[in-house]
Amino acid sequence: MKEGIHPVYHETVIRCACGAEIPTGSTKKEIRVEICSKCHPFYTGKQKLVDSAGRIERFRRKYEKFQKKETPESTE
């Protein structure tokens, strides 16, 4: 193998937004992530509730005119 072509390998810590720190090795000195296995809903079993009700209502209001079928006025 050629010498001097490999990147410098550091002992580093992955820091999550939840405060978890995971020691590892990398070519970067510091790694920051927004979500990790200690706070991800898949691994914790907890689900985050997303307020999608407002989005659904806004969608329905926007497209309700397409759902309404105009009925012609019947003459008697």
Swiss-Prot record:
**GO-annotated molecular function:** metal ion binding; rRNA binding; structural constituent of ribosome
Q: Which UniProt keywords apply?
A: Metal-binding, Ribonucleoprotein, Ribosomal protein, RNA-binding, rRNA-binding, Zinc
Query: Which cofactor(s) does the record list?
Result: Zn(2+)
Leader sequence segment: none
SUPFAM superfamilies given in the database record: L28p-like
GO (cellular component) term, any one: ribosome
Q: Any idea which positions bind Zn(2+)?
A: C16, C18, C36, C39
Q: What is this protein called?
A: Large ribosomal subunit protein bL31
Instruction: Give the organism the record lists.
Output: Syntrophobacter fumaroxidans (strain DSM 10017 / MPOB)
UniProt lists the gene as rpmE
